[in-house]
């Protein structure tokens, strides 16, 4: 008996909270650390990855029955790389300064675990329309995490949002002393940890079963 096909609503909204690519699957961490020092770069990266994931899923699903199993990963990489090149060229043409800030991380979307994972695990086994929305949904889940990180890091690290002053800083005669630590990549790692803790506190079903049990404490005499 074939399993029921997931609905568009499920694949679009489940990755945001229920099965978040970063929060639950722990994928796409590297770019999340690097591009979230401000909301502008976080937003552009989020849009870029969402579009690439959605359209790569769509195109791969459309030709999934014609792809030989032995070269399916190569075909997936070619499609994803082509889409990433288009995104990169558009950024260089219309938002060159942002393209410079994002540096190599747009190009590294090609090897992003979220994009590759959805292409292999979902698009190769499902129809084009639902595959497209699965890609968009996972992109939205990734985007939500990036925007939260970018919001916290830019607001409390520089007192700004999208480059606009929100908290008047001491250097400008205001009251807020920016926390420069939040602008460093390691701070994003700790923030991601806090978000994961909050998600798993809220949704108990996301808590993983322990892989081992601590041995009971024994006295030194019993140990020997």
From Swiss-Prot:
It is found in: Cell inner membrane. It catalyses: a ubiquinone + n Na(+)(in) + NADH + H(+) = a ubiquinol + n Na(+)(out) + NAD(+). The keyword NAD applies. InterPro entries: NqrD, NqrDE/RnfAE. The chain crosses the membrane at residues 43-63, 67-87, 104-124, 132-152, 179-199. It is a multi-pass membrane protein. Belongs to the NqrDE/RnfAE family. NQR complex catalyzes the reduction of ubiquinone-1 to ubiquinol by two successive reactions, coupled with the transport of Na(+) ions from the cytoplasm to the periplasm. NqrA to NqrE are probably involved in the second step, the conversion of ubisemiquinone to ubiquinol. This is Na(+)-translocating NADH-quinone reductase subunit D. It comes from Pseudomonas aeruginosa (strain ATCC 15692 / DSM 22644 / CIP 104116 / JCM 14847 / LMG 12228 / 1C / PRS 101 / PAO1). The gene is nqrD.
């Amino acid at each position: 008996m074939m399993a029921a096909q997931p609905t568009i609503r499920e694949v679009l909204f489940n990755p945001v909270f229920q099965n978040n690519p970063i929060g639950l699957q722990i994928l796409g961490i590297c770019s999340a650390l690097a591009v979230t020092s401000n909301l502008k770069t976080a937003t552009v990266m989020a849009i870029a990855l969402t579009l690439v994931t959605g359209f790569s899923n769509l195109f791969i699903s459309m030709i999934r029955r014609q792809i030989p199993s032995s070269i399916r990963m190569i075909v997936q990489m070619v499609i994803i790389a082509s889409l990433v090149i288009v995104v990169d060229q558009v950024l260089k043409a219309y938002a060159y300064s942002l393209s410079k800030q994002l540096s190599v991380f747009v190009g590294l979307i090609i090897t992003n675990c979220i994009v590759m994972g959805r292409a292999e695990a979902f698009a190769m086994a499902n129809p084009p329309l639902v595959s497209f929305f699965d890609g968009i949904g996972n992109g939205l889940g990734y985007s939500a995490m990036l925007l939260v990180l970018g919001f916290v890091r830019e607001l409390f690290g520089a007192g700004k949002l999208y480059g606009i002053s929100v908290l008047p800083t001491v250097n400008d005669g205001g009251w807020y002393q920016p926390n420069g630590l939040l602008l460093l990549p390691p701070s994003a790692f700790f923030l991601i940890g806090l978000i994961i803790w909050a998600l798993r506190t809220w949704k108990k079903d996301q808590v993983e079963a322990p892989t081992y049990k601590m041995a009971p404490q024994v006295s030194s005499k019993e140990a020997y």
